[in-house]
């Protein structure tokens, strides 16, 4: 069974999903949520303890009171994607890394584009902070598809400097 709840944030209403007692998705837009919900069976709006905690931690993050998340997270991906997502979780609050930095950190220094694709497939943005990955010249690059304004907002919360493309 999949459960979900909504969280009011400065970005608008975000939707958090849980499956098998693990947080599995954070939707930044209604469109993404609707697309997902149409493909998944057995989905119920219910605020489980994990979803309530995720919602609380998100609210603390947006209020500037939380620097790291401590939630039971799970997302499906290739072994390479899993390594990238783990590397993202190690980027400290208020710091950024380049795609090349992440590629090197996962032992594949030439896999810069693959790191970008793994970021794009991150189903847990904010919780797994792919917004902290910027271009090698501090350029603001893609986020959650084409949502660079969200990335800029998150970088500003954390006071991470970047350059507009």
From Swiss-Prot:
Source domain of life: Bacteria
Disulfide bonds: none
InterPro entries tied to this protein: MethylDNA_cys_MeTrfase_AS, MethylDNA_cys_MeTrfase_DNA-bd, MethylDNA_cys_MeTrfase_DNAb, MethylG_MeTrfase_N, MGMT, MGMT_N_sf, WH-like_DNA-bd_sf
TM region positions: none
GO molecular function list: methylated-DNA-[protein]-cysteine S-methyltransferase activity
PROSITE patterns membership: MGMT
Family the UniProt entry places it in: Belongs to the MGMT family.
Name listed for the protein in its UniProt record: Methylated-DNA--protein-cysteine methyltransferase, constitutive
Native source organism of the sequence: Bacillus subtilis (strain 168)
Taxon lineage: Bacteria, Bacillati, Bacillota, Bacilli, Bacillales
Gene for this chain: ogt
């Amino acid at each position: 069974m999949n459960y979900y709840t909504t969280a009011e944030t400065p970005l608008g209403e975000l939707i958090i999903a849980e499956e098998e007692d693990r947080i599995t998705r954070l939707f930044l837009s209604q469109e993404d949520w609707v697309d997902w919900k149409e493909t998944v069976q057995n989905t119920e709006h219910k605020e489980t303890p994990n979803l309530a905690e995720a919602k609380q931690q998100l609210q603390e993050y947006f209020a500037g009171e939380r620097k790291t998340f401590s939630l039971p997270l799970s997302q499906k991906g290739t072994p390479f994607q899993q390594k990238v997502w783990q590397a993202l979780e190690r980027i400290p609050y208020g710091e950024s890394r380049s795609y090349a930095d992440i590629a090197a950190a996962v032992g594949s220094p030439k896999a810069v584009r693959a790191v970008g694709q793994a970021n794009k497939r991150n189903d847990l943005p904010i919780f797994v902070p792919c917004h902290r990955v910027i271009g090698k010249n501090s350029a603001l690059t893609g986020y959650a598809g084409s949502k660079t304004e969200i990335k800029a907002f998150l970088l500003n919360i954390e006071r991470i400097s970047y350059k507009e493309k």
